[in-house]
A protein has these predicted regions:
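Transmembrane-helix signature of polytopic, membrane-embedded enzymes
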Residues: 16, 97-121, 140
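Extracytoplasmic catalytic/substrate-binding loops of multi-pass membrane glycan-assembly enzymes
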Residues: 35-46, 56-68, 76-80
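Short acidic/glycine- and proline-prone juxtamembrane loop motifs at membrane-interface regions
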Residues: 124-138
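Transmembrane-embedded, aromatic-rich helix segments that form part
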Residues: 162-168, 177-181
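Short helix- or helix-capping micro-motifs
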Residues: 23, 112-123, 168, 172
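Membrane-interface transmembrane helices that cradle and orient dolichyl/undecaprenyl
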Residues: 102-106, 145-160
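Loop-to-helix entry region of an early transmembrane alpha helix in multi-pass inner-membrane enzymes
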Residues: 62-66, 76-95, 128-132
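Start-transfer (signal-anchor) and selected internal transmembrane alpha helices
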Residues: 1-29
Length: 181
């Protein structure tokens, strides 16, 4: 099958590098900016929950408090530690979108670059990368699940189905809504 779009030579590396530079620049900006914002009430709630680890909470799954507990354990109880993993998850989601778009387009890095760039420019996505909440791990695990399901269908290997189930399960620990998406 002929790819829908193919790259040759320097073009392929150019668009890959540009995507990684754009994702890196946005992530560095987010990491700098999150240290200047005060915590929101939801973030403070997740921070309190992180100090009392449990398998579930009254109104939220446990992933975000667990992640905050891990970051706080490494960096101390700071506002930066509470928010640290949101920009990281959003950067990983953009990288996954790049690779998923590359697969879907038949190996083209140009459409993959534009897909990742468009994702970075969505206002809701940009906002979710600044605040600690259920959205950033949900988006990451959902995107990972989509990528793995696509790979399972294309490559016909059971490993991808198992990994997609694991990613969906981790997404379920982030927000129960993932089962309906």
């Amino acid at each position: 099958m002929t790819p829908l779009y193919s790259n040759y030579g320097k073009d392929r590396l150019f668009y890959f590098r540009m995507a990684m530079v754009a994702i890196g620049a946005v992530t560095i900006f987010r990491l700098f900016y999150i240290s200047m914002l005060p915590l929101t009430s939801d973030e403070a709630y997740f921070w309190v929950c992180s100090r009392h680890p449990a398998l579930s909470y009254y109104d939220t799954p446990p992933m975000v408090p667990w992640l905050i507990a891990a970051a706080s354990g490494m960096l101390g109880n700071t506002e930066f530690a509470v928010r640290l993993l949101s920009p990281v998850f959003m950067a990983l989601s953009a990288i996954l979108i790049f690779f998923l778009s590359r697969e879907v387009s038949g190996g083209g890095d140009k459409p993959a670059f534009f897909s990742a760039f468009m994702l970075l420019s969505i206002p809701g996505y940009a906002f979710a990368g600044l605040l600690s909440g259920v959205e950033s791990p949900l988006i990451f695990f959902y995107t990972l699940s989509l990528y793995l399901i696509y790979m399972a269908v294309q490559r016909k290997k059971d490993f991808y189905w198992i990994a997609a189930g694991l990613a969906t399960g981790l997404g379920f620990l982030s927000k129960y809504l993932i089962l309906f998406i």
